[in-house]
């Protein structure tokens, strides 16, 4: 999810920029409600299959354990010799205290990292993919299709979010038509793939995946946040059999001069050191030890055990980072996409009046809200058959915050494409519901 695009990477961990960042990025920290309930949603709908989650790379945690044990051994050895050193008492005591602290820290790091590795492997081995795996470019990709009927609704999630992020949407929509969600490379049950993670590459891989699975059309694409950028790219390269587009608070390419330097930095520029901090934090198992990987939220108490397998705490941060590094390339690839003639387009947007936090919105947050609202309005230029709906009271996470209204409007959209419902008489409109 991302402009809102900065994904939700920093909303929790970088609270100094908390006001303007969307929820995809919150998923990188296990404490966010969105990330924490993804596996609970999966459990609720009894997802099950034969394929375990991607194994989390062990190079980092193994390295942490090795270094911690080495320092631990050297510290203990030094502690044993401190009392025999010809130093003043205060110096010996100080050195002993410092070495003892180092020993405790290294011992704790070894224990938490080892515990985290074991927990990851255990939960990744017992929770299976809900859908099927298909080979795309020599690597396995996960596609989960439910329901029957035409057209097929293909779901593209936001940044950092696996297919299970559509858990509040897919079960309901699949009662009416065929619905397919999938894991991008390196997410969920899909294997990581070499090469860039920009819009062209992601759209190409999605098209190949659908071809492999025999999902050839007619197709409606629905993309949330950063996923909206990817379905634009797909529509430009593979318009055949495409019968509709649905943008769910979708990101649009940034136009030159559209953002102030301060807002641009706040939304799109993630310092590299933050990635390394996140990697080290997760490698040490700190979120798991603090309970962030097993938080129980109201309404999901019965799924506590399955929530322990939450994909956020087991995510491939390297793949997520690669996708972030491809943002500006993705903007360049999609800035001139469209228009799409009379292709039916539905645009869902968050409430511009909804701001994070209890206090008055900051100047930067107000600026972001104005720019974001205009970007949403600009999506109407893609087709003469467009409608925009602002979800009153909803933030960026529309599929979770207003799943009821989203499902209702999408089902009407599907029936209109089937010619089973009257065609809209308010094309070009923007309304709030």
Spans of model-derived segments:
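Flexible "cap/lid" subdomain of the alpha/beta-hydrolase fold that forms the substrate-access gate
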Residues: 199, 203, 238-242, 246-381, ...
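Active-site signature of alpha/beta-hydrolase-fold catalytic machinery across serine-
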Residues: 233-237
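Catalytic active-site module of serine/aspartate enzymes centered on a nucleophile-bearing elbow/loop
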Residues: 384-433
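Active-site loop/oxyanion-hole signature of alpha/beta-hydrolase fold enzymes
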Residues: 144, 184-222, 238
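Gly/Ala-rich beta-loop-alpha elbow adjacent to hydrolase catalytic centers
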Residues: 223, 227, 231
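Alpha/beta-hydrolase fold catalytic core
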Residues: 11, 16-151, 175-177, 196, ...
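Conserved HGGG/HGGXW glycine-rich cap/lid loop of the alpha/beta-hydrolase fold
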Residues: 139, 145-189
């Amino acid at each position: 999810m991302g402009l809102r695009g900065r994904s939700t990477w920093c909303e929790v961990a970088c609270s100094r920029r908390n006001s303007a960042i969307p929820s995809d990025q919150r998923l990188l920290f296990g404490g966010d409600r969105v990330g924490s309930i993804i596996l609970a949603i999966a459990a609720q709908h009894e997802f099950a299959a034969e394929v375990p989650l991607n194994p989390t790379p062990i190079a980092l945690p193994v390295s942490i354990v090795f270094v911690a044990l080495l320092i631990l051994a050297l510290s203990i050895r030094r502690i044993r010799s401190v009392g025999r050193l010809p130093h003043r008492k205060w110096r010996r005591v100080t050195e002993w205290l410092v070495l003892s602290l180092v020993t405790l820290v290294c011992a704790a790091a070894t224990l938490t990292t080892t515990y985290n590795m074991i927990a990851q492997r255990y939960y990744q081995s017992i929770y299976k993919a809900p859908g099927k795996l298909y080979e795309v470019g020599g690597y396995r990709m996960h596609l989960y299709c439910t329901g029957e009927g035409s057209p097929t609704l293909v779901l593209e999630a936001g940044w950092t979010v696996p297919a299970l992020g559509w858990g509040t949407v897919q079960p309901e929509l699949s009662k009416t038509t065929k619905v397919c969600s999938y894991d991008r490379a390196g997410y969920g049950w899909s294997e990581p793939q070499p090469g860039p993670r920009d819009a062209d590459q992601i759209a190409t891989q999605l098209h190949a995946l659908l071809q492999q699975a025999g999902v050839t059309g007619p197709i409606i694409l629905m993309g949330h946040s950063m996923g909206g950028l990817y379905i634009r790219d797909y529509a430009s390269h593979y318009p055949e059999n495409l019968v509709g587009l649905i943008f769910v608070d979708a990101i649009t390419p940034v136009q030159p001069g559209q953002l102030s330097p301060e807002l641009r930095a706040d939304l799109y520029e993630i310092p590299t050191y933050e990635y390394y901090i996140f990697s080290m934090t997760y490698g040490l198992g700190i979120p798991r030890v603090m309970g962030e990987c097993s938080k129980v939220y109201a309404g999901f108490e019965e799924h506590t055990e399955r929530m322990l397998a939450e994909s956020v705490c087991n995510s491939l941060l390297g793949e997520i980072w690669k996708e972030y590094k491809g943002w500006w390339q993705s903007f360049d690839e999609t800035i001139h996409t469209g228009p799409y003639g009379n292709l039916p387009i539905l645009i869902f947007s968050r409430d511009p009046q909804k701001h994070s936090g209890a206090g008055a919105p900051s100047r930067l947050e107000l600026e972001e809200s104005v720019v974001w609202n205009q970007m949403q309005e600009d999506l109407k230029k893609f087709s003469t058959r467009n409608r925009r709906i602002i979800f009153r009271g909803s933030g960026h996470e529309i599929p979770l915050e207003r799943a009821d209204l989203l499902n209702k409007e999408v089902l009407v959209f599907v029936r209109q494409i089937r010619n089973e419902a009257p065609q809209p008489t308010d094309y070009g409109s923007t309304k709030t519901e």
